[in-house]
């Protein structure tokens, strides 16, 4: 297969010899915005992240295989892929561990008032905090019970939480005390102390967390979004945030987040630059997924 590999796979060059022994022919594109090093018609398979944001997929007349380095499919014109029966794989499970750790970190940061302690340290201020919360015994709702959501569930269970799942395709799973469909989300929000969003962005999930659903959240509850920014209606969130215990946002409707956005300066908001997926084990896991899919193909 004629493979175009982009710099989205950091360890790609370590495997070129292996690919060639399997009969694949390789062209490499470091930056996906740049011109291709080969004709579009030459390409039969791609390993990429956002290649089709910069190069129309219709130009790849002989494309039959796509391997993404991302967990989501939202940067690919999936209707075209399905119509042309192109085989496609994502990086399922690659980023689940660091993202789950990040979600847990964010909740603990808010419960244990990490911001306050850090600010006091910079001022050499010895001041006890009397309103720290325990994670033990809290009810956590994971919205999106795929690999990322389930890794989150495992970690919250270890801390003694009750974990409830909400998913597009509810099922029985040992990591959740129950799992319901999205149609039950509004009722479930009433009883949960922590809500973690890990589901994909689709037409159905766009602005899933809107004004009416925020109104259903418990006073003092925490929202974590490590999924996609557009799942949350940002303006509605800003309005309700004073009533919440806090919010952990790693993704936003517009990235980078504008310097003028009030979220930067809200005391109970943790704002991070789409960073939750980063971990020192990603490279090994991603290479394993890519190689397994190619071997099976």
Please provide the spans of the model-predicted regions.
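Rossmann-like adenosine-cofactor binding region
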Residues: 170-262
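Phosphate-binding beta-alpha-beta segment of Rossmann-like dinucleotide-binding domains, i.e.
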Residues: 86, 91-139
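An N-terminal-biased, well-structured beta-alpha scaffold segment characteristic
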Residues: 1-87
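NAD(P)-binding Rossmann-fold cofactor-contacting core
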Residues: 158-175
């Amino acid at each position: 297969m004629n493979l175009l590999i982009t710099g989205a796979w950091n360890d790609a060059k370590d495997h070129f010899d292996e690919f060639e022994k399997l009969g694949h022919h390789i062209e490499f594109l470091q930056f996906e915005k740049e011109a291709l090093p080969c004709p579009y018609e030459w390409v039969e398979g791609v390993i990429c992240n956002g290649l089709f944001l910069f190069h129309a997929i219709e130009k790849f007349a002989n494309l039959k295989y796509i391997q993404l380095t991302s967990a989501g499919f939202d940067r690919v014109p999936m209707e075209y892929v399905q119509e042309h029966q192109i085989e496609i794989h994502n990086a399922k499970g690659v980023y689940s561990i660091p993202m789950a750790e990040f979600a847990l970190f964010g909740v603990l940061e808010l419960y244990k008032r990490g911001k306050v302690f850090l600010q006091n340290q910079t001022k050499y201020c010895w001041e006890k905090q009397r309103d720290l919360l325990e994670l033990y015994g809290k009810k956590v709702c994971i919205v999106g019970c795929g690999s990322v959501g389930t890794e989150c569930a495992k970690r919250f269970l270890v801390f003694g939480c009750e974990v409830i799942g909400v998913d597009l395709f509810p099922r029985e799973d040992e990591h959740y005390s129950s799992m319901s469909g999205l149609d039950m989300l509004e009722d479930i929000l009433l009883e949960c102390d922590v809500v973690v969003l890990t589901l994909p962005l689709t037409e159905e999930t766009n602005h899933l967390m809107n004004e009416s659903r925020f109104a259903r959240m418990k006073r003092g509850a925490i929202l974590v979004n490590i999924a996609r920014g557009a799942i949350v209606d940002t303006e509605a969130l800003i309005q309700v945030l004073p009533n919440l215990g806090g919010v952990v946002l790693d993704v936003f409707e517009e990235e980078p987040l504008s310097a003028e956005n009030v979220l930067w300066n809200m005391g109970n908001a943790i704002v991070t630059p789409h960073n939750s997926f980063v971990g020192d084990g990603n490279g090994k896991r991603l290479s394993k997924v890519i190689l397994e899919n190619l071997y099976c193909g």
